């Protein structure tokens, strides 16, 4: 199946489904080419018994469980997971091995040639969120998102929400949890991770942060950027 979503498919899916929430767990310690992505999706179906699909572009999906029952391996074709006999209320769990990008699609992985530092960041507009986690990847199917990220100890991890829990190091890794977000489209979700240099400020009680590679520190201009952001 081609990695494409037609207008008719998006229209049909929007009329059939209501997405409530995503819980997304990303393990960014697995290697240089891939990372582990675990998605738990809660959604409703307007016509119980109907079929649909969820988007996922990944080298492999090791576990797909819909409403407590495992789906056959051929339900996943590399870009989509076929979902049959949907209930009125549904829970889907997908464990996948997703690929890093070097071209800015999905989870981009960059190695700084100056010091070898590795930096990761998502670029999901307009149809690339499903390269990072299984999702109904269209703007009108909004939902709440809760991210948990495991990353090398010493890295910064950033998402749409401020982290509420940063676990103690376990081996060479640390676990970051971000609380559920307001409803948003899949392409608006974001994760960045790496040994970023951080300049922090705040405005009217709202925390501000400016992140950059260690080799391109912006401390000298941080007051300017913080001032511009406040406006």
Provide a role label for each language-model segment.
Residues 1-231:
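Acidic/His-enriched low-complexity segments
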């Amino acid at each position: 199946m081609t990695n494409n979503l037609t207008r008719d498919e998006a229209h049909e899916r929007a009329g059939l489904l209501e997405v409530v929430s995503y819980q997304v767990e990303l393990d960014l310690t697995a290697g240089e080419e891939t990372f582990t992505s675990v998605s738990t999706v809660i959604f409703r179906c307007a016509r119980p018994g109907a079929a649909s699909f969820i988007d996922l572009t990944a080298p492999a999906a090791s576990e797909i469980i819909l409403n407590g029952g495992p789906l056959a391996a051929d339900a996943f074709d590399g870009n989509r997971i076929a979902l049959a006999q949907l209930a009125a209320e549904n829970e889907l769990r997908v464990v996948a091995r997703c690929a890093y990008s070097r071209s800015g699609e999905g989870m981009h992985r960059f190695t700084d040639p100056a010091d070898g530092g590795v930096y990761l960041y998502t670029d999901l507009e307009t149809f690339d969120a499903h390269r990072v986690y299984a999702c109904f990847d269209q703007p009108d199917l909004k939902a709440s998102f809760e991210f948990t990220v495991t990353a090398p100890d010493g890295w910064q991890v950033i998402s749409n929400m401020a982290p509420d829990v940063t676990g103690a190091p376990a081996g060479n890794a640390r676990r970051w949890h971000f609380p559920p977000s307001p409803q948003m489209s899949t392409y608006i979700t974001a994760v960045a991770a790496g040994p970023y240099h951080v300049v922090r400020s705040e405005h009217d009680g709202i925390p501000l942060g400016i992140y950059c590679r260690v080799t391109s520190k912006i401390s000298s201009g941080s007051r300017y950027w913080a001032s511009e952001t406040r406006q």
